[in-house]
Regions:
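Alpha-solenoid HEAT/Armadillo repeat architecture
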Residues: 12, 44, 65, 214, ...
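Conserved catalytic-core segment of NTP-binding enzymes
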Residues: 148, 169-183, 198-303
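G-domain G4 guanine-recognition motif of GTPases
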Residues: 27-28, 45, 49, 111, ...
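Charged, compositionally biased N-terminal leader segments and the immediate start
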Residues: 1-27
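Primarily NTPase-proximal linker/entry elements flanking Walker-type ATP/GTP-binding cores
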Residues: 17-138, 145-165, 171-181, 185-190
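Electropositive phosphate-/nucleotide-binding environments in soluble metabolic enzymes
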Residues: 12, 33, 50, 54, ...
């Protein structure tokens, strides 16, 4: 299956929800104010967000749609153009390119978003692109997390740096970076605990890990990725706000898009925060993390069902 086919299949539920919803609303050849308001309300209910939905409504109202043409298809095209203008600047295809120098990526996210699995899939892409990879098992609060990351390291051929459950996460990160330096390994992916007892502990732990990383290399971490679960809908906006208070988020990966009609939340979060999008999780297989491509996303999200 090609990449675009994966995008289309992954966004099938979201695209069907959008196209069928628009068909129900648009029953007249002319788009009047009542129809515009219904379109805006529908987009908001589809997790596209208030700001983006309002802008899309304004664009539709300014464009004169030919009554002879299919109004739903025309509005779908307006939506596609809006997505492209918004999201092309947020592509980060360079993230996966082979690096000559040390590149440390701190990976964050709440429990259950598929963070450790995502690290494994990133590692697979890095390896396929010719990079040597280290996984740093800094979620030391759960023995299962260490075991899971070790399993992924075996699958993709990455080196794993780990310690006993309950060990200091920052010390594991330090050892991983030192090992990378000593062995000329360019890519270090650091897994972190999804959730601690309270926000202060989470903030302190993240700050400690980040500070230790910076002591080993003043330019690190080069990236701080937040993994988000698309099925959480608008809740992911709160997650981004909270994690960004702890440490500046430089990229997003959204998982579980194949199992939800809430793909519109990616538009909402892009409009509000302009954080680059690294990749999209469109399935459970090792190759189902797709490098974000705005055109493929726009095509898949607005495919007419």
């Amino acid at each position: 299956m090609g990449i675009f086919e994966k995008f289309k299949l992954g966004f099938k539920k979201s695209a069907y929800s959008i196209s069928s919803g628009l068909r129900e609303i648009i029953v007249k050849k002319e788009i009047d104010d009542e129809t515009l308001n219904k379109i805006e309300e529908f987009l908001i209910s589809s997790d596209v967000g208030i700001d983006a939905s309002s802008e899309i409504k304004s664009i539709i109202s300014q464009k004169k749609i030919d009554p002879k043409k299919n109004a739903v298809e025309e509005i779908n095209l307006i939506l596609k153009e809006y997505i492209l203008e918004l999201m092309i600047p947020l592509e980060r295809k360079d993230f996966f390119e082979k690096k000559e120098n040390l590149n440390v990526t701190l990976v964050s996210g709440v429990n259950g978003v598929g963070k450790t699995t995502t690290i494994g899939k990133i590692g697979k892409i890095f390896k396929d692109n010719g990079s040597e990879v280290i996984f740093s098992a800094c979620d030391t609060f759960r023995a299962a997390a260490i075991d899971q990351l070790e399993s992924w390291s075996d699958k993709v051929g990455a080196t794993i740096i780990k310690s006993n459950p309950g060990s200091d996460p920052a010390s594991v990160a330090y050892k991983a970076i030192e090992h990378a330096k000593n062995n000329n390994i360019s890519q270090v992916l650091i897994d972190t605990a999804g959730r601690l007892q309270n926000k202060k502990n989470l903030m302190d732990e993240f700050k400690k890990i980040a500070n230790v990383i910076k002591k080993t290399d003043e330019n690190a971490p080069q990236d701080v990725i937040l993994v988000l679960d698309a099925t959480s809908g608008q809740n992911i906006i709160n997650q981004l706000e909270e994690f960004d208070k702890i440490i500046k988020i430089t990229g997003l990966i959204m998982t579980k898009l194949d199992g939800t009609a809430k793909g519109g939340v990616l538009i909402a979060i892009s409009k509000k925060y302009k954080v680059p999008i690294i990749g999209l999780g469109l399935g459970e297989k090792i190759d189902d993390l797709q490098i974000f491509n705005a055109e493929q996303f726009a095509d898949a999200f607005t495919q007419f069902n």
